[in-house]
Amino acid sequence: MIKKKSNSFLSCDRKTSVNVVIWCPDETEYDEPVAVLQICHGMIEYIDRYDGFARYMAERGFVVVGNDHLGHGKSVCTDDDLGFFKDKNPGEALAKDAHHLTVLIKKMYPGIPYYLAGHSMGSFVTRRYICDYGYELDGVIVMGTGHQPAPMVFAGKVLADVVRLIKGDRYRSRLISKIMFGAYNKRIKNVRTVNDWLTRDEAVVDEYNAGKLTTFLFTVNGYRGLMNMILYVRKPRNIERIPKNLPMLMISGLDDPVGEYGKGVYRAYNSYHGHIDDIDLRLYEDCRHELCNELNKEEIYEEIYGLSLIHI
């Protein structure tokens, strides 16, 4: 039987208790775990949304672990902190916390392969992590990422900085949200809801639309942190800091607007291709943004599991 446990640690902001969830394989089937898989979730969601994927991997011998990022899920002091990262240097906070979790889990499970997977905003957390702490890992999985043109990202950062000066760091801007997400449904026929771009699975979309922890507006601080991460991970000098021998799997849906329907994912792939020795790109027909919640999610799980085994 899979054991699911909760834990916590103090964030790098020195005040927030970061919520951690651990899925452990059945001890009667596995004397020791095959590997550890750490997950970085996306924007405006929480780690428990990966329960199905985590259980799939745990059933195959993996310890799966993840935390709610600052400003997400249970990693808040009050609801006012939802969508807020950290007063200073918000762009580095999520990767710092993710690395702290790695250190803690490695003490619990020493000497076995350690993988990091990140989805959407979590893919940018993961891409920042491997610039700063790539030496900790035996492999990395980048899901639902993008490579937006630098002028566009910089313009978004400037807008967030201006709004911050006028309204403050905790202001929740519908304008920025509309600019970020407003066009994501444009290729979908017969749109049902504002979040149809997430997945073809209508039940998942409806559950997402009904949740308090998946429908809040991001703060200006959160957007600033996200823009800073996106700009950070694309700089050649930061990419050069990634260990060349770190295997990377990059996966995305061809109907994912975050990855510009494959174009942005190819640009991200090409930015690493000349530096990382072992990098693999997989794009899935008809799939939207949340691959782990898609109609063919079992295929995605199987792909990740199979490619992980190659490097164990």
Identify the function of each model-found stretch.
Residues 1-27:
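N-terminal cap/lid segment of alpha/beta-hydrolase-fold proteins
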Residues 34, 41-45, 254:
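Active-site glycine-rich loops that stabilize anionic/oxyanionic intermediates
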Residues 86-106:
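Alpha/beta-hydrolase active-site loop
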Residues 126-213:
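Alpha/beta-hydrolase-fold enzymes
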Residues 250-252:
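Short beta-strand/loop motif that positions the catalytic acidic residue
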Residues 263-264, 292-305:
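Post-His helix in hydrolase/transferase enzymes
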Residues 310-312:
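Conserved small/polar residues in nucleotide/adenosyl-binding loops
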